[in-house]
Amino acid sequence: LSPPPNGTLEAWCWDLIHTPHLEHKLCPPAPPDPRTEEAWELAAVPRRIPRAMRPPCLQSIERSPKTPKPAALRNPKTRALLLHTFLHHELQAAELFAWAVLAFPETPRAFRTGLIRLCLEELQHLALYRARLASLGHHAGDFPVRDWFWERVATCETPAAFVALQGLGLEGANLEHSARFAAQFRAAGDSDSAAVLEQVEREEIGHVAFAVQWFERLTGAPLDYRRWREALPKPLSPAVLQGKPINRKARLRAGFDEQFLQCLEAEPSTAIRREA
């Protein structure tokens, strides 16, 4: 794959994914203004990047450790481990929004502009987790990471599949996970980290709403559980794209309807682990 022309949004996305430098990865320079014509590559070709470059300090592992029990969060190092995991989730999400800009240049510019906006918001969430991590005496790279999101999302062959997995699936599930961990961190006495998780939950509602809107536009039909399920890359199941219990209030605000949520709750369990 050849890199996009310098100074374009596509080049900014390319650099975010490919840079081996930690600081550029976690806090990249501002992108070109997507409202300007010159910010976009002329006649861009699809660039499907199989994986992101990782700085040497970010040790990647093939299998994640089990999620700590709530009582273990009274240990600051355990909280730091989880915050580091959340930071890496946000990094992957930011990279994958950039990935979709490069992979699907034929999509409406409004869609790709929205992907850039979501990418920047994920980097803001990353910065919040990074600050909380530092308050506990830890830094990015202190714990191993797993590129679980990359392993799945980079297999998406169409824009609708990307939106189905990244937006409706992974970000939808984060509505449950962020609320659950916010309660656990607060119970462990870490109200500052809980507040960050609650902020992430609120802002992810908008990300999921973007996915609902664009899944409908890309498929030409209202969001429907069966259509969403069929759009997911195999062998992924909706069973691993949710938390227990369903964050019904947040999901309804994001645009899911009650029938969709009932189908999601009834989804049979799967052998595929959703440990990231």
Regions found by a protein language model. Name each.
Residues 1-276:
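Non-heme di-metal
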